[in-house]
Amino acid sequence: FPPWE
């Protein structure tokens, strides 16, 4: 759930 995924 990272901002880039």
Swiss-Prot record:
Chief localisation class: secreted
UniProt superkingdom: Eukaryota
Post-translational modification Glutamic acid 1-amide, affected residues: E5
Subcellular compartments: Secreted
Any Gene Ontology biological process: defense response
Keyword list, A-Z: Amidation, Amphibian defense peptide, Secreted
Keyword check for Secreted: yes
Expression sites (tissue/organ): Expressed by the skin glands.
GO CC list: extracellular region
UniProt keyword annotation of Ribosomal protein present: no
Family (UniProt): Belongs to the frog skin active peptide (FSAP) family. Tryptophillin subfamily.
Annotated protein name in UniProt: Tryptophyllin-T2-2
